[in-house]
Every structure is written in C-alpha cells, then in structure tokens.
Regions:
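Pore-lining and gate-forming transmembrane alpha-helices of multi-pass membrane transport proteins
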Residues: 129-133, 203-224
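Glycine-rich helix-loop "coupling/hinge" segments at transmembrane-helix boundaries
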Residues: 185-211, 215
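N-terminal transmembrane hairpin
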Residues: 2-119
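Hydrophobic alpha-helical transmembrane segments of membrane transport and translocation systems
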Residues: 214-242
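Membrane-spanning helices that line or support transport/gating and their immediate boundary helices
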Residues: 37, 41, 142-149, 153, ...
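Juxtamembrane helix-boundary/capping and inter-helix hinge elements in multi-pass membrane proteins
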Residues: 30-32, 152-161, 196-202
C-alpha cells in the first residue's frame, strides 16, 4: 500500500471548522453560553499546536529521561483531573488516584511496549508517549466516573460494597460500548490513522486489538484499585450524609 501520508494544507484544514461553527451557532441561538465552547475550541488548538512542537523536540532528542519526565507529568495530570467529579478535596484522594493509575496504567503500558511490541530502545518516544497518553486518559475517565457514581450511591444510603460494584460497572460502560462497537460502528483512531498512512488493514487490526485490550485492562484495573483504596475516605463522607 502507499505509505505516503497526505499533507493537509491550512486552507483545507479550515474546512474542518464548518461543522464546529454550525454547533456554535446552535449553542448561541439556544442561549447555552457559547463562550465556554469557543474557549474550549481555542484551548484545543493551542494545546495541540504546543504538543506538536513538544513531540517534535522529544522525538529528535530521543532521550529516555525526557520520555520518563513527560510520562510522569501526564500521569500526575490525569490523576488530578480524574478527581474533579467528587466533592471531597482532591488532595485527600490524589495519592489514591496516582497509585491506581500506576498499578493499572503504567504496568499495562510496560506490558504492551516491552512485551507485545518489544520496543528497541525500550523508551521509544513515538510509541511510549502516544500509548501512555491513551492509557492514562482512559484511566482518568474510569476513575472519574467511578468516583462520581460511588459518591452518588453512598448519598442514597447504599452500603459501600454495593456502591463500589455499581461504581465499577458504571466506569466500564464507555469502554464496554467501545468493545461492542469497534469494527461495526466505528474504526478507532489508531486504526484509522494507520490505514490513512498506508499500513495494511490486517496489520492495523493487530495494533487496534492491542489498544483495545490495553484500554480495557488499564481502565478496569485503575478503577477497581481506586474504589478499593478510597473506602475509608468515602465511608467518612457517607457517615456525614446519614
């Protein structure tokens, strides 16, 4: 297959904003507060442009220390953001979130990069950082959903063990839906990107299977570890509600 990636000109890229402008117009017409949406889009553009330059620098330097530093920063950011859905102080649960993502995310990242892919060098930036980002982001989402649902169930008076099970089930809904839909409803990002880059669909499928297993495993482990480790903190909160 042709391995040359088609370059997107800025003029052509601007066409991608047409549906975005349509949604902004709808939000404005319905008095939903369009400024937040515009800010989010602007922030997305700035963040992606910055990460483009940062990744270019990282890939060129090819330093294991820089890769590890970036992964640690991503892990800490994911841990902090994951706690925004709970009313408890983030500082109270931050170590639990970090611990959960390390066990669920870092271990799975190492298994995939060193076992499945057998990277050489082991810290290859073009693999470690994108895969780490995927894993940490999904761990973040699963913990966030689990924390929000756990607190909600405890407020309703459910015992912790029952609330924990409901919270874990809730946290796995998005990734479970993704497993059911992949190949039927959607072609996930990595697979689509590889096919567009000219990689054989059969090879792209193998990578996507790895990614789906990696996301499901890391999300489930992180959420389960988090729910197990925060029992004391949330039990105290439950007692205040009673």
């Amino acid at each position: 297959m042709n391995s040359i990636v088609q370059n997107i000109s800025l003029a052509n890229l601007s066409l991608a904003f047409i549906p975005v402008l349509v949604v902004i117009a709808i939000i404005w017409r319905w008095n939903m507060g369009y400024k937040t949406t515009i800010y989010a889009i602007f922030r997305m553009l700035v963040q992606l442009l910055l990460i483009g330059y940062v990744l270019t620098y990282i890939f060129e330097t090819n330093s294991n220390y820089i890769v590890i530093t970036v992964l640690i920063f991503m892990l800490l950011a994911a841990s902090w953001i994951s706690l925004r859905t709970t009313s408890l102080p983030r500082k109270t649960l931050l170590l639990n979130a970090v611990y959960s993502i390390v066990l669920g995310g870092v271990t799975v990242l190492l298994l995939m990069t060193q076992g499945v892919l057998s990277l050489k060098p082991w810290y290859s930036p073009s693999y470690m950082i994108p895969l780490g980002g995927m894993i940490f982001a999904n761990c973040m989402n699963s913990i966030s959903l689990a924390a929000e649902r756990l607190e909600s169930e405890l407020k309703q008076g459910h015992p912790y063990e029952k609330a924990k099970v409901i919270a874990l089930r809730t946290s796995l809904i998005p990734i479970t839906n993704m497993l059911l839909a992949v190949g039927l409803v959607s072609l996930p990002g990595m697979m689509t990107g590889q096919i567009l880059a000219g990689v054989s669909p059969l090879i792209a499928v193998r990578y996507q299977i790895m990614v789906m297993c990696m996301i499901f495993g890391s999300s489930g482990i992180s959420a389960a570890v988090f729910l197990h480790s925060v029992k004391d903190s949330f039990t105290e909160t439950k007692n205040r509600f009673e």
